[in-house]
Swiss-Prot record:
Keyword Iron: yes
Protein name: Alpha-ketoglutarate-dependent xanthine dioxygenase xan-1
Gene: xan-1
Record-listed 2-oxoglutarate binding positions: 206, 336, 366
Domain of life: Eukaryota
One annotated GO molecular function: alpha-ketoglutarate-dependent xanthine dioxygenase activity
Length: 420
């Protein structure tokens, strides 16, 4: 346990020489079970600065403490699991997410994921976990004879329901705790898109890419397009895409007309369809991230009022913007060890399951994310906030510096209120 005089130490991850990776950090000297306001403030700033935080030796952290940590990043959020319905009802059972999740009975915001048979864990009995395999989702697959040596990115995504209005806004963070991790093998992750791109990865890695880097490497023309475009997501997206297949890179779907027709989906409420900015602004650094869930996109709303409705065209546009950002040199493939607690900024990164396990290899993880209390800030939000600050300064209503923007002040007030 860290003493109350210990200050958490944030250390940027050491990436391989020549790597273009510039995100991720380790945290030491923090007690998650007894997290002080001071230490959480350090964690919060570190997360929005580094996007992925790794805290070692956290096997003792309870599901409740994991949930409380996760919600602390968005204290106004309702205690709802970020992906929405995961039950066995008609909606949940059709979702592509349904087979991969087991809910902890006494902490329903926390899910158990992994691979293999687990006799008992946290109130669950006889759990059969299934690590997603690209063969079930991609339009093409690696030969079975290469299954244990080669793999693919399963599905690049953001953790989000993407339907349900603001009540199901994308989670701010996701936390992952490694309970049991198979060791000993590495695999070659292949892109199979004609580029020859591949990446050496640890078995069962979680791969991360930075939405900020994905935006930064765009041309100026592409950046202007991304800043001014809004993405409309399909209603009930994980049911809608349930029969569709992915590109070999895991970055979006191929267009074969296999999406579930709108009339066959569960009831659609138009005001619950989410239309979000293509770029999301970091609440601490102000930087823009290219944040699109490529598998769930349906339409693009352009600055001039044009709506791109041809699904194949929509996907090609999004793929052209995102594909450079998943180049091998830009992917952080975390090498999991038992007890690793990873906190990642879900509004500033994309991530993917990777790997193919033998049936006997047991992998057990806890995942927690909570639907956001409000939608992410878009590119225009900073300008609006700066205009508001300027106007209020002129009227003598409030006096703040550029560094003390209104979103920051509001967040600070919320945190103090919760702590009290």
């Amino acid at each position: 346990m860290a003493s109350n005089t210990t200050v958490p130490v944030i250390t940027p991850l050491a990436h391989p020489e020549g790597s273009k990776l510039d995100f991720g950090a380790t945290v030491s000297g923090v007690d998650i079970e007894n997290l002080t306001d001071r230490d959480f403030a350090i964690l919060r700033t570190a997360l929005f600065t580094h996007q992925v935080l790794v805290i070692k030796s956290q096997s003792h952290v309870s599901p409740r403490a994991q949930y409380e940590l996760t919600q602390r990043f968005d204290p106004l959020a309702a205690p709802l699991y970020g992906h929405g319905n995961t039950d066995s009802g008609s909606v949940g059972s059709k979702s592509i997410l349904h087979p991969d999740l087991k809910t902890i009975p006494h902490q329903p915001q926390v899910q158990v994921i992994g691979n293999g048979f687990v006799p008992t864990y946290e109130g669950l009995s006889n759990i059969q976990l299934r690590h997603p395999h690209h063969r079930t989702f991609h339009s093409t697959s690696i030969p079975a004879s290469h299954d244990l040596t080669h793999t693919r990115f399963y599905r690049w995504h953001i953790d989000a329901a993407l339907y349900g209005g603001v009540a199901r806004a994308p989670p701010v963070v996701t936390t992952l705790l490694a309970v049991k991790v198979p060791q000993g093998r590495r695999q070659t992750c292949v892109y199979d898109d004609g580029t020859g791109d591949e990446l050496d990865v640890p078995l069962g890695t979680t791969a991360f890419v930075s939405g900020y880097k994905m935006y930064d490497i765009l041309s100026e023309t592409q950046k202007a397009f991304a800043r001014s475009t809004r993405v409309e997501y399909a209603p009930h997206p994980y049911v809608w895409m349930s029969s569709a297949k992915s590109r070999s890179t895991g970055l979006g779907l191929v267009s074969e007309g296999k999406e579930m027709p709108m009339e066959e989906l569960p009831e659609i409420e138009e005001d619950r369809i989410q239309i979000l900015p293509m770029c999301w602004r970091n609440p601490v650094t102000g930087k823009l991230a290219l944040q699109v869930h490529p598998s769930a996109v349906r339409r693009l709303h352009l600055e001039d009022g044009t709506v791109v409705e041809d699904l194949k065209e929509v996907r090609e546009i999004v793929y052209g913007l995102q594909r450079p950002g998943i180049a091998p040199g830009l992917v952080y493939a975390h090498d999991w060890e038992e007890g690793d607690l990873v906190i990642f900024h879900n509004r500033g990164t994309l991530h993917s399951v990777v790997g193919a396990f033998a049936e006997s290899e047991v992998r057990l993880f806890r995942q927690c994310n909570i639907a956001g209390s409000e939608f992410p800030m878009g590119p225009e939000e900073e300008e609006k906030e700066e205009e508001l600050v300027h106007a209020e300064q002129e009227e003598g209503v409030v006096e703040v510096t550029k560094q003390e923007s209104l979103p920051e002040l509001r967040m600070g007030a919320v945190e103090v209120g919760v702590a009290a």
